Each structure stands twice: as C-alpha cells, then as structure tokens.
Amino acid sequence: MEYEFRRNSLTGTFLASFSMDHEVLGQWFTEELGPELAKIQQVLDMIKEIQTDKRGAWRLVGNDFTLELEREQARVFANTLGFEQEYELEEAMSLYDAESEAYCGLEDFEQALLSWQTFIEKGL
C-alpha cells in the first residue's frame, strides 16, 4: 500500500492519496481526520488497545466514511455502501463500489496514520 501526503498551497488543506484499491483511505484521512491531531491520537490509542487485547474491535462512524478496526485489519468504507436501492437496475448494470471500501493490515494502517500525524505536525 503506497500513499502520498500533500498540502494545498492556496487553501492550506491537507490531502492524502493512496494507491489503487486503497483510494478510500485517502478520502478518509483527508475528509474525516484532516488535521485534527486529537482524533488521530484517539485512533492510534484504539489501535494500541486492540493490539494489547484490551479491546476486540472498534468502530468510528464519520460523516461520509466509517473506520472499523479489528485485531488483524482495518476497514474503511463509505457510509452509503450497502444501502438498499430504491429502484431496480437493468440486468447488465450494477453500481460501482470498488472505490468505496478498502481493507489493509492493522500494522500497515497504523504506520500510515503515524506518517499522517507527523505530516500534519510539521505542516501546522
């Protein structure tokens, strides 16, 4: 899993981009975490609790995305994922959800989160 962090020089907004199959992680970092160091620390604390068996799993529901942490993996998905459709799609058509959900190992997620935290601290 590769990622890159940038800061928009005009708006000051922090941006995260992740490699294919993990794009939604970039959206979650950018839109749900942003530069909020307290929220970043909260997620890191929950990861430690899971790693030390003080907690089995944890979920953080955001405005647009939800983070689920378990012993072996992290999952980020759009809150709209899995909602029932009010209308029937034609037989050959389907909704594209691949960029609305991503899984990665808990340690990889923790490393990306620590990198994001460092990037934010240096940019503030």
UniProtKB/Swiss-Prot annotation:
Family: Belongs to the UPF0231 family.
Designated name of the protein: UPF0231 protein Sbal223_3655
Pfam families assigned: UPF0231
Phylogenetic placement of the source organism: Bacteria, Pseudomonadati, Pseudomonadota, Gammaproteobacteria, Alteromonadales
NCBIfam families assigned to the protein according to its UniProt record, in alphabetical order: PRK05248.3-2
